[in-house]
């Protein structure tokens, strides 16, 4: 009896899956950095526009304060602490030149905070200014006045200025001991002051400037002179990772 082979219905044909060995690939050291790069081009452009806008606003602040050089001390210090001083190099240089020109005229004026801040900014930028301006804060016995201890912002400013001493400046050597002793005592009672001192030390150490800038952002928003635009600029500048991605994408 002949056997007839009948083709199986199409619905009855079962395709067996083709099994392949799974390769055990190690994760890329680059992660997904390049996967998102195209989307970041627009973001980078938008961020650049915002940075330029914020820089323009801050330039207006320099212009408004130009009539009184002492009013520029605080903005310059804030800009440097926030790590965005390179955006305003010409404005800062011009302002410090004016401040230096009147340095002798205000030799005996100002409170501890402003005298120390003026001294620190000028000396840090290479001006040869005398530390004799701090003699006015000593008593008849040659010691720093005890009344200064309650001026914490002034003491912190003085502490930072003392780090810019040169060999043989006994006034500043004594100032460093004086401020360190009293600030350590006060910081034990104030977490904010402790944070400010830590930020100051980090900023004095060149290798930790960016870390100091990040820490100061949280301090700055509570300052009386707080500028929302300046803080935005600092945050954008700190978080600007798009440029780093672009540099990586250029690697052959």
From Swiss-Prot:
Keywords: Lyase
SUPFAM superfamilies membership: Terpenoid cyclases/Protein prenyltransferases
Pfam family name, one: Terpene_synth
Domain of life: Eukaryota
Annotated InterPro entries: Terpene_synth_N, Terpene_synth_N_sf, Terpene_synthase-like, Terpenoid_cyclase/PrenylTrfase
GO BP, sorted A to Z: terpenoid biosynthetic process
Recorded GO MF terms: terpene synthase activity
Any further remark recorded for this protein: When compared with the genomic sequence of the wild strawberry, an insertion of two tandem cytosine nucleotides in the middle of the coding region caused a frameshift that was followed directly by a stop codon, leading to the potential production of a shorter, probably non-functional protein.
PANTHER family to which the protein is assigned, alphabetical: (-)-GERMACRENE D SYNTHASE-LIKE ISOFORM X2, OS04G0344100 PROTEIN-RELATED
Family (UniProt): Belongs to the terpene synthase family. Tpsa subfamily.
Protein's name according to its UniProt entry: Putative pinene synthase
């Amino acid at each position: 009896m002949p056997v007839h082979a009948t083709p199986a219905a199409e619905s009855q044909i079962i395709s067996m899956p083709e099994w392949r060995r799974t390769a055990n690939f190690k994760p890329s050291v680059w992660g997904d950095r390049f996967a998102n790069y195209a989307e970041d081009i627009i973001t980078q452009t938008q961020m650049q526009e915002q940075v330029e806008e914020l820089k323009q606003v801050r330039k207006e602040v320099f212009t408004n304060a130009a009539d009184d050089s002492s009013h520029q001390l605080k903005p310059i210090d804030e800009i440097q602490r926030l790590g965005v001083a390179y955006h305003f190099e010409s404005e800062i240089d011009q302002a410090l030149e004016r401040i230096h020109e009147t340095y002798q005229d205000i030799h005996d004026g100002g409170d501890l905070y402003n005298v120390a801040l003026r001294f620190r900014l000028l000396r840090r930028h290479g001006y040869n200014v005398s530390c004799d301006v701090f003699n006015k804060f000593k008593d008849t016995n040659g010691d720093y006045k005890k009344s200064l201890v309650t001026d914490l912002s002034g003491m912190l400013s003085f502490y930072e200025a003392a780090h810019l001493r040169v060999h043989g400046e006994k006034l500043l050597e004594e100032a460093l001991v004086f401020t360190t002793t009293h600030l350590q005592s006060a910081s034990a009672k104030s977490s904010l002051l402790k944070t400010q001192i830590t930020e100051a030390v980090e900023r004095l150490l060149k290798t930790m400037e960016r870390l100091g800038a990040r820490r100061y952002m949280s301090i700055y928003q509570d300052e009386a002179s707080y500028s929302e635009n300046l803080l935005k600029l600092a945050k954008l500048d700190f978080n600007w990772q798009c440029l780093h991605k672009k540099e990586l994408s250029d690697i052959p």
